[in-house]
Amino acid sequence: MPIDVDAKAHTEYICPKEEFDRILARFPETSYFHLSLVVPYNVGTRIGETFAIDLEEDVDFSKHELKIKGQMYKIEKTWFIKPPKYDSHRTVKIGQTLEKELKYAIKQRKINRLKYGGAYLKTYLLPDNSITQVRADITVPHKEITPLCVKDNGELVTPDSFKYCARVIHWELGNHLFHAHCLRHTHGTMLAEGGVNPKTVMERLGHKDIATTLQTYICCITAKP
């Protein structure tokens, strides 16, 4: 069976730093898509894991750590938080660059809450792990969460929302190889190229087993001329 070269190139696409910088110039820190780009590039999260991150609960600046403990997924028109793929709960180290981005987002979130007041949309996790949003001036007896990505007024940004970001990168920036998973793949490749132990790569990315890591990254690196 002939190989679809375009499909193969799309699947294996690694985003060069210069290209990633160009993407961030289009989606700067003031954009509600910004963190959905910088987190997988720096941590290697899956798209559902990225959007399930809680800025208040999952980030520990004192330990320079980020917890990956869920993924956002949709059933019909409702979004839920469920355990990550393969139940791969993990805590990963983060660097100063990502910490700076996260601190800015947290600060801006607080500013926007004051700006919008009662009209700000707070996000809650219901007992069935579904997500709902309610105006800040309405009291709700459920657990409030702080999603990684929201609009200025608190409106939830989801993996479906990211499709718009990808379309802009495809058509406005002219990068048709870009896709949501490529930033995770790029991070894993950078780790492998940097000589990081395969077991460490496996644990950081939440792979099911070491064979997946070796097949996806290490073999690709050793195959390079």
Where do the protein language model's features map onto the residues?
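Basic, Lys/Arg- and aromatic-enriched nucleic-acid-binding interface segment
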Residues: 1-47, 51-53, 89, 112
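Conserved tyrosine-mediated DNA breakage-rejoining catalytic core shared by Y-recombinases
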Residues: 2, 53-137
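Extended hydrophobic-aromatic, low-complexity segments
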Residues: 36, 61-62, 68, 77-78, ...
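Catalytic-site neighborhood detector that most strongly recognizes the C-terminal catalytic loop/helix
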Residues: 6, 14, 72, 205-225
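Short, flexible helix/strand-to-coil boundary loops that buttress conserved ligand/catalytic motifs
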Residues: 24-27, 54, 63, 106, ...
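Short, basic (Lys/Arg/His-rich) helix/loop patches that form interaction surfaces
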Residues: 21-30, 43, 92, 111-118, ...
